[in-house]
Amino acid sequence: GILSLVKVAKLAGKTFAKEGGKFGLEFIACKVTNQC
């Protein structure tokens, strides 16, 4: 149901934040500075 979807989304979000945090920050920085 919807609750399990929310759980999966939260878990995916945590995993992404942990694994992709550094990449995400670099991506945001390059977007802001138009260096991508």
From Swiss-Prot:
Signal sequence coordinates: none
Disulfide-bonded cysteines: C30-C36
Compartment annotation: Secreted
Tissue specificity statement from the Swiss-Prot or TrEMBL entry: Expressed by the skin glands.
Transmembrane segments: none
Keywords, sorted A to Z: Amphibian defense peptide, Antibiotic, Antimicrobial, Disulfide bond, Secreted
KW Acyltransferase (keyword) present: no
Record GO biological process: defense response to bacterium
Homology family: Belongs to the frog skin active peptide (FSAP) family. Esculentin subfamily.
Function, as annotated: Antimicrobial peptide.
Protein name from the UniProt record: Esculentin-2R
GO CC, any one term: extracellular region
Pfam families tied to this protein: Antimicrobial_2 (PF08023)
Source organism of this protein record: Pelophylax ridibundus
Primary subcellular site in the record, as a coarse category: secreted
